[in-house]
């Protein structure tokens, strides 16, 4: 009997060890995560990849910027997190069209699934596994709120492997379009270029991109997702449906809050004010400006 992989079985990455899938299957089955074992190796490899980037960041950053060595330990930690965030956003931006093409072929918006889309979401899940590790390890610096955020993000992604609501994943991946500009804004702050012409141009692009993908497109998709959930409220477990509704609204409300903070920060930087905002947006929605 042929063991060739059919197109429907072909993922973004080669399939992982069957032994790993069989090892995690009983746990996944307990929560109805029937598609998760197939992608567990991608999650683990992704988390390892981002940890390697985090380890390499101090070495690379010292060569690229003389400012890095002068930063406090807390600020270097945050700098490295922004480096990892930048890499993650570029990866997801590059895969965005592929993911959109995959989900548009789903016959069912609620329970649609493909191996390729599952692998792309697994890359994101791996990032949040890494993020959870970092926020727990440095909870005295990041605060408990970021630990909770990492857990919530992992929960949302993980339970898409029932499968459930994978169709709407590209909306949240598209949010990463604003992340490179946001991280550039952060790096300019930390290299004494606050209020520079470059930062103002970048800030303008950041605001426009953020409003387009996270506010306009984000809220439209939030409405579409909510309608889909409510129209099938008795099909999926009600607790899961309510959680996704709450998470969906919370993330989009946070985006409104963050964009107001960003506009205020850019306005003050345009006037050369040195005082930093209490909160600064990142790809995880808020990193302390330390």
Swiss-Prot record:
UniProt subcellular location: Endoplasmic reticulum membrane
Annotated InterPro entries: TLC-dom, TLCD
One BP term from GO: plasma membrane organization
Pfam families in the cross-refs: TRAM_LAG1_CLN8
Parts of the chain that traverse the membrane: 40-60, 80-100, 110-130, 139-159, 166-188, 200-220, 238-260
Membrane topology category: Multi-pass membrane protein
Chief place where the protein resides: endoplasmic reticulum
Residues of the TLC domain: 74-271
Keyword match Transmembrane helix: yes
Origin: domain of life: Eukaryota
Organism: Schizosaccharomyces pombe (strain 972 / ATCC 24843) (Fission yeast)
Coiled-coil ranges from the UniProt annotation: none
Gene Ontology CC annotation, any one: endoplasmic reticulum membrane
Protein name as it appears in the record: Uncharacterized TLC domain-containing protein C17A2.02c
PANTHER family: CT120 PROTEIN, TOPOISOMERASE I DAMAGE AFFECTED PROTEIN 4
UniProt KW keywords: Endoplasmic reticulum, Membrane, Transmembrane, Transmembrane helix
């Amino acid at each position: 009997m042929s063991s060739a992989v059919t197109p429907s079985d072909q993922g973004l990455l080669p399939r992982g060890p069957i032994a790993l899938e069989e090892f995690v299957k009983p746990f996944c089955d307990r929560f109805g995560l029937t598609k998760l074992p197939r992608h567990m190796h991608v999650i683990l490899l992704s988390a390892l990849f981002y940890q390697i980037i985090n380890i390499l960041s101090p070495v690379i950053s010292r060569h690229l910027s003389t400012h890095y060595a002068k930063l406090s330990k807390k600020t270097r930690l945050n700098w490295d997190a922004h480096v990892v965030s930048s890499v993650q956003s570029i990866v997801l931006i590059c895969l965005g069209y592929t993911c959109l093409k995959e989900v548009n072929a789903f016959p069912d918006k609620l329970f649609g699934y493909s191996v390729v889309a599952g692998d792309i979401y697994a890359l994101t899940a791996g990032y949040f596994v890494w993020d959870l590790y970092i926020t727990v390890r440095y909870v005295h610096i990041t605060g408990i709120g970021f630990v909770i955020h990492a857990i919530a993000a992992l929960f949302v992604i993980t339970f898409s492997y029932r499968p459930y609501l994978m169709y709407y994943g590209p909306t949240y991946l598209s949010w990463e379009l604003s992340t490179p500009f946001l991280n550039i804004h952060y790096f300019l702050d930390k290299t004494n270029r606050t209020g520079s012409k470059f930062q103002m141009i970048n800030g303008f692009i950041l605001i426009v991109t953020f409003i387009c993908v996270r506010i306009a497109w984000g809220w439209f998709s939030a409405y579409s997702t909510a309608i889909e959930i409510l129209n099938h409220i008795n099909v999926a477990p009600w607790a899961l449906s309510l959680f996704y509704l709450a998470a969906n609204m919370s993330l989009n409300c946070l985006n409104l809050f963050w964009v107001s903070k960003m506009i205020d920060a850019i306005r003050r930087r345009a006037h050369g004010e040195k005082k930093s905002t209490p909160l600064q947006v990142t790809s995880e929605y808020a990193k302390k400006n330390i």
